[in-house]
UniProtKB/Swiss-Prot annotation:
Organism: African horse sickness virus 4 (AHSV-4)
Name of this protein: Non-structural protein NS3
UniProt feature coiled coil, ranges: none
Highest taxon listed in the record's lineage: Viruses
Physiological role: May play a role in the release of virions from infected cells.
Family: Belongs to the orbivirus NS3 family.
Classification via InterPro entries: Orbi_NS3 (IPR002565)
Amino acid sequence: MNLAAIAKNYSMHNGESGAIVPYVPPPYNFASAPTFSQRTSQMESVSLGILNQAMSSTTGASGALKDEKAAFGAMAERLRDPEPIRQIKKQVGIRTLKNLKMELATMRRKKSALKITILISGCVTLATSMVGGLSIVDNEIFEDYKKNDWLMKAIHGLNLLCTTVLLAAGKISDKIQEEISRTKRDIAKRESYVSAASMSWNGDTEVLLQGIKYGDS
């Protein structure tokens, strides 16, 4: 038997083993149920959408709309956080909510007291200004003022004092109002996170949005 016959016989018995590049069959991909990574990817996609809504411009927005955007941000944060961190933030948020609501009630009482102070100071300032104005247009009142110099000084001093109190109380009231708005936004954010952290999600957005608590709702 010559060399060519031997080579042909060897190739027939060994099949593809004599090929320069061995043949490898393609892998078969079987359909499988959604994995945890797929679910995480879905949650991240929803989180990005919510975060995009929360990061939109707030120029000219009212306080309620700003609170809503803060709630959107809390929802996006909830979807990004893993389960252990989510539960920790939930428990801390529940405790913080109690303190925030107490602070909010205290600030509202302070603002009410300042409103009363502003009202009284405004009335006294207006009255003393009217008395001072009458002394200019009425000679008899002006003569009485000249006879009772201490009364004129007392009226002017009271007018100056009430005007100062009026301006100071107004500035303090504005600062307290800013703190109230910020505290209400923090409460809305934490309530939204706690409400969302108490829910489970199976991939259905409608189920995710049911029962979410926002603000005082």
